[in-house]
Regions:
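Generic structural signal for well-ordered alpha-helices
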Residues: 3-11, 35-46, 66-71, 111-114, ...
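Active-site beta->alpha loop and helix N-cap motifs at the rims of alpha/beta catalytic domains
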Residues: 1-18, 23
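Hydrophobic faces of well-ordered beta-strands that scaffold small-molecule active sites
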Residues: 17-20, 53-55, 81-83, 117, ...
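Alpha-helix-loop-beta-strand connector modules within alpha/beta enzyme cores
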Residues: 34-55, 98-126, 166-172
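Active-site glycine- and acidic-residue-rich loops that bind
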Residues: 1-4, 30-31, 51-74
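Glycine/Thr-rich beta-alpha phosphate-binding loop at enzyme active sites
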Residues: 21-33, 66-122, 158
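Catalytic cores of alpha/beta
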Residues: 61-75, 117-123, 132-149
């Protein structure tokens, strides 16, 4: 219900929406990481919006599990995926007990997951996220099949200039 409420609130201000079913520090979201839940979320979402929807998927241990999740998204028009969220970390020293590791160390995993998903689903729109910290890495992901990129940690450490560096490099 909360997802639908937010879609109704924000759809007039967006050109697309991301539904994050994989935040590692939100315990209840794990229940959505299966094909039936994804199908249900998308079915209900399509009743209230025609905006493109991107489902942000978790970083999974068994790469073949992406097949099941992505097949559920393909039953709906204008649905893509975001690969992938942070790497889940559980540690009692964290104030909430769990969270997600981000940054450069995730890049190789992101690239592997992207290559697998692109080969299995050549038509799906893929936004790629995870460990992108240089123009070369951005180019590698785009050449491997990402349609667009999301950059978080590099933006924090490098500032907005990283976006300009990546864009300048890609335009050459």
């Amino acid at each position: 219900e909360e997802i639908i409420e937010n879609l109704l609130l924000f759809q007039d201000f967006c050109f697309a929406v991301e539904i994050n079913i994989s935040s590692p520090n939100t315990t209840d979201l794990k229940k959505f990481v299966n094909h039936n839940s994804i199908r249900s979320i998308l079915k209900k979402s399509r009743k209230v919006t025609n905006l493109p929807i991107f489902i942000k998927l978790p970083r999974l241990i068994e790469i073949e599990y992406y097949d099941e999740l992505i097949k559920a998204t393909q039953e709906f028009d204008q649905v893509g995926v975001v690969l992938c969220n942070t790497l889940p970390v559980t540690d009692s020293r964290l104030s909430v007990g769990n969270g997600g590791r981000s940054g450069k160390s995730l890049f190789d995993s992101t690239l592997s997951i992207l290559k697998y998903v692109r080969k299995s689903f050549p038509e799906i729109t893929i936004l790629c996220s995870g460990g992108i910290s240089s123009p070369d890495q951005a180019k590698m992901l785009l050449e491997s099949g990402a349609n667009a990129l999301q950059i978080y940690t590099a933006l924090i450490y490098e500032g907005p200039r990283i976006i300009k560096e990546i864009n300048d490099s890609l335009s050459n």
